[in-house]
UniProtKB/Swiss-Prot annotation:
It is found in: Plastid, Chloroplast thylakoid membrane. It is a single-pass membrane protein. May help in the organization of the PsaE and PsaF subunits. It comes from Chloranthus spicatus (Chulantree). Keywords: Chloroplast, Membrane, Photosynthesis, Photosystem I, Plastid, Thylakoid, Transmembrane, Transmembrane helix. Its main location: plastid. Belongs to the PsaJ family. The chain crosses the membrane at residues 7-27. GO terms for cellular component: chloroplast thylakoid membrane; photosystem I. The keyword Methyltransferase does not apply. This is Photosystem I reaction center subunit IX.
Length: 42
């Protein structure tokens, strides 16, 4: 039971850190390369 409580307290923290860093990465990519849906490579 203690392991389950430890897991339930760790998983939201890791998920928050992961999604926060992912959102920050996407924001920085969109800041450096705006309008990424239409890359003007052609």
């Amino acid at each position: 039971m203690r392991d389950i409580k430890t897991y339930l307290s760790v998983a939201p923290v890791l998920a928050t850190l992961w999604f926060g860093s992912l959102a920050g990465l996407l924001i920085e990519i969109n800041r450096l390369f705006p309008d990424a849906l239409a890359f003007p490579f052609f």
